[in-house]
Every structure is written in C-alpha cells, then in structure tokens.
Amino acid sequence: MDPGLKPSSSWTHKIVDSIIANRSQTAVQNFRRQPLANKLTALEDAIVQPRKDSTPDSIAAILQELVSMGALKPSEVGPMFSDLLIRVHKYNSTNVQSNLNVLLGDIRAAQSEAIRSTNVGELSNQVILNDFLSRLPPVVPMGQHNYEAFKQSLRLMVNEAPNVTLFKSGPDTMMQVNIRGVNTVNLNSAFSNLQNLWGVVLDSDRVPGSISSKLSSNTRVLLLFLAPFTNENTFTPDTFLWQIMQLYRETVAASIEAPLETEREVAETVRDMGGDIDDVGRTMAYLLKNKEEVMANPRTLSPRQLGVVRYVQESLMDRIDRNGEEPIDALRNIVFSFAPSYFEANGSFIRKLLSYLEVALRNSPNYFREIYSNKYWTPPPSFWTQNYGDFFVEREAEAEREALEEAGPRESYSFLEDPSSSPQSSKIQSLGTCGMTMLRPMSPSVPPTPSVRSAPPSVSYGGPSRSSLSVDSASNRNFGATLARAVLPSAAAAIGNAAGEALYPSLGQFLAPAASLAATRFLSGNRGERIKRQRQRRRAEIERRRIAELTPPSPAPSLSSESSAPSLSSVRTSYTPLAGAKYWNPVDDPEGDRDVSGTGLGNPFDYLRPRNGLK
C-alpha cells in the first residue's frame, strides 16, 4: 500500500482495518492472493453489515428443549433444524419482517408527499365534511328520505363546486362560498334550524308563511346554494323541503339553465344553412340512442296530484257510464265536485288536468275513454310539455265512428229505420245537389239565404214531421233512461246489501255490487244490437256516399213557364257562413282544418296544435 495514501475518513479507516488486519505487509499479500469472489464477499460484509437475526438461535433452543424432554431423538435434530430454518427464513423471519416494515414506511412517505403536492383544499374539505356528517344523528323522527337527500346534496356541492371552502370555528363547521362576494354559512346552525322541518307535508301548491318564517337567514342562504344541485326527484313530493327547493331552483334557473356556447353555435349554423334545429336534434337522438325523440326528464306525480287524478277518473266514470251524462258536460260540471278550499289549494293542477282531458275528448275520444277508465293511467310527457301530438294520430273518420259507438243508447235511434232521415245523410244530400263533396258537417246555426225559398225543417205537408216527433220522443226517452240509470243501480245495491245482511252477516258487501251490476245491465238492454244495427246503417251510408262521389252530378232542371212549379227537393239551397267566421272551402283547401266542434267552422283549439302542424 502506498504510504502516501491516507484514509479520507474514520469510516474508511474502519472498513480497511476490518479487511486487512494491522495493515501488515503479510495481510496485504494474503488478501491479494484470494480469489475475486472472496475479495468481493469480504468487501460486501465490511461495507454492508448483515442484519442480526436471532431466528437460528431460537430454533436451536426449541429443538434442544425438546431433546432434553425426550420428545425428539438427537439424530432427528439435524434435518429438522435445517427444514425449520429454511421455512422460517422464507416466510416469517425477522429479516423479512424488517424489510416489509421498511417498504411500508417508504410507501407511506411517498403517499404523504404525493398528497401534499396535490390540492390540499379539496382534501381538507372532505375531511371536515366527513367529520361534520359523522357528528349528526343518523336517524330523524320523520322525513328520513329528505334528511339523507339533503346530506347527499351538500356532499355533491362540496365535491363539485370549486369555490367552496369548509373550516372549523370552535365547535361549529363553517362553509364559505365565493360567489359575488364571500358568503359564510354555519352548517351546525342550518341543520339545527331544519331538524323539525324534514318531514313536514303540505296540502297545497303554496308554501305557508307560518312555516317558511321559521327559516333563518343562514338556512335560506344554504338552501339557495344547494338548489342547483337538486331536481324534482331529489326530495319527497308534497313536502315543505320539496316545495321550497323548487322555488329556489326557479329563482336561479335563469343563470344555471343557460344554453351552452356549443349548442348555440350549432343552432345558429343550422339556421343559416336553412335547416330545422328540431330535425337535427331528432336525428342526433336517433344516431346516439336509436330513438327519434329526445324525451325530457320524467316527472312523477306527487301523492296529492295522484289523488286528484284518481278522483277525476272515478267521477267521470260515475257520471258518464252510470248516470249517462255527455262527456263534455261531465267535464264541465266536475269542478263543482271539489270543495272550494281544496280547489283553491290545487286549482292550477285541476285546471291543467281538465284542459288536457277536454282536448283529448275533442281530438281522440278513444284516448279520452282510456284515460278515465284505466285506474293505472298517469299523465304522459305531453301533459307537462303541452305538446298534444301524441293523441292526434287517430283519423277523423275513426274518431267519429268510435264517438258514435261510445254514445250508444244516449242518442236517438229514430233515424235507423230510415237512413234518409238522419242528419248526416240530409247534409250529404244537400251538398251533393250543390255539386261538391264535403265530409265535414255543416253548422246548424247558419241560416239559408233569403233569396232562396225553403221550408222549415220541422214542417211537412200533410201532417206533423216525423223528425219532430222523434226528437220529442227521444228527449223523453233519454230523460227517463237517464233517471233510471241514476236511481235504479243505487237502489238495487241498497236492496242487495239489506238482503245479504239479513241472510248472513257481512254478505251484503258482496251482494250489493252484484245487484248494482245486474240492474245496470238490465237497463242497458240490447245496446249491443242497437250498436250493431247502427254500424250497418253507417257502413251503408258510407257506401252510398262513395257511389255518389263517383256518379257525375245531374244537370239542374231548366225552369220554364210551361213547366210546373219546382218541388222543395229540387231547389238548390246555398249556405253562407256567419260574419267573421272562418269557413272551409274544399276547392281552395282540400284538407281543411280539423273540425272538432261539429260546426263546420274553424278549429277553436287550433292554438293547441303542435308547432309542426299535424293535421
């Protein structure tokens, strides 16, 4: 070793002394003659000291104790010590445990460093919010669903809003929101203020001032901040919290429901190219979801609204099917069945429901009957959007035929014996003499022109008119039938109940409905036969109408002095519409407007037609 080289430190001097003892020349020569592997092993042992492990000593002590007790033979100790040492070192040695502990420490240090390098604010918000929610009671006396939904809405706001900070101020948890200034809310105070309001149920669409006045300003600010993170299905319908959050959502709707810039740019581009943005939306919906229409978020009825719907259905079924009232009269008179206080509290929904039913009745009688006869019916999306295109698909002829079948025994069947006396056939004949075909009924209130002589419809030469007698007799029959249908089923039910109770207790509740049903069927009589005959007459009338359309009109007879006076049937009666009324001209407009009033004039519900202009 060069005497000029000196150890750079005491640690180096110590390592060299452990390899070459006393630094003698003999020791240096001996180390030099060693193989390279021995030199490397000596250096490794000197630089990296092996960890002390007491596992072999522990195993040897255990085996020695077993030999001294006579449980093991001395010849068995060697192989057993070897196997145990290998197994312990492989699976459960102190060396392995120490290495694992070191590895876990390194992982914890790396995780802590990664967390410290991320957003500390969001992490602290989660820690503080979890601590606050863990201190709240898990169960409340009433309104558990609203209680849990409110906590989830608060967590959603803390997770999603970037300008929210939570911090502790003594025993209270504070939430600071930076929106148009700094707003601080005390969460402990807000939850304490709401503890008695979670399950409050309202019986109207308005929030009583006696309840809303209990909200503190701190709580109102929290409700305003949480409103954008809720929807109509978050809380239980008809509860105070559901109603007040709906008001706050409407307050902030202008700022949170603004269309996105991308959607606005696409809409402007489509309009500039002359396209329809609605068609583009339906096309995109079909490409993305394989559906042509983009359905809005489903809206569910509250228990109070569902009760209104079921009550209206039962009332319509009782008025139309049992009492024999006309559907339009039943709809107009059903509002008198509600108590004034109840109608005042729920008037907006009742008026909306009745308006929907009236439009359905005028445009699709089949759909109207399905509405009031199906006890599981709930309003479709068109009820909320006021786009009534879902029941405009029924054709007018089908609607008229089904409406005629639905009327059944309530109408006069005097014209079934003579089809020429029916009002519809007389209108078609009068229109055929004028030289044009018009399938829509004319208005009975339109008078003939004074220049043309025509006889009154109720006057007939040689005796009273058959139509006048049929009208009088039909009105009397309808009145008697209506009175019988209104009284006899109830009386039969009462008699059946009394007879059943007299025979056996609690038997009356089964006999009463059966007696009422039997009386109703007895009063209906041969309604099926009458409807069948009416269908046949209707079919024959349609065939005659088609034949009349294919047959060219006969020329009008020339009037001369030698000819006799023309008969009333040969006189061409012309009709003029009332002043200011919109009249349908089949020449200018072959399709015409949908006549739902039966007057031949304009459609009074034209403003309810969808924007795409369904016929």
From Swiss-Prot:
Induction (record text): Expressed in the late phase of the viral replicative cycle.
Region spans: Disordered: 400-473, 528-615
Biased composition (Low complexity): 419-430, 451-460, 557-570
Keyword terms: Capsid decoration protein, Capsid protein, Host nucleus, Late protein, Phosphoprotein, Viral genome packaging, Viral release from host cell, Virion
Residue ranges of the region described as Binding to hexon-linking protein: 124-238
GO cellular component: host cell nucleus; viral capsid, decoration
Family: Belongs to the adenoviridae hexon-linking protein IIIa family.
Function: Structural component of the virion that acts as a cement protein on the capsid exterior which mediates the interactions between the hexons, including the peripentonal hexons, and reaches all the way to the penton vertices. Two hexon linking proteins IIIa, one from each facet, stabilize the unique edge interface between a pair of facets. As the virus enters the host cell, hexon linking proteins IIIa are shed concomitant with virion acidification in the endosome.
Protein name, UniProt field: Pre-hexon-linking protein IIIa
UniProt organism field: Snake adenovirus serotype 1
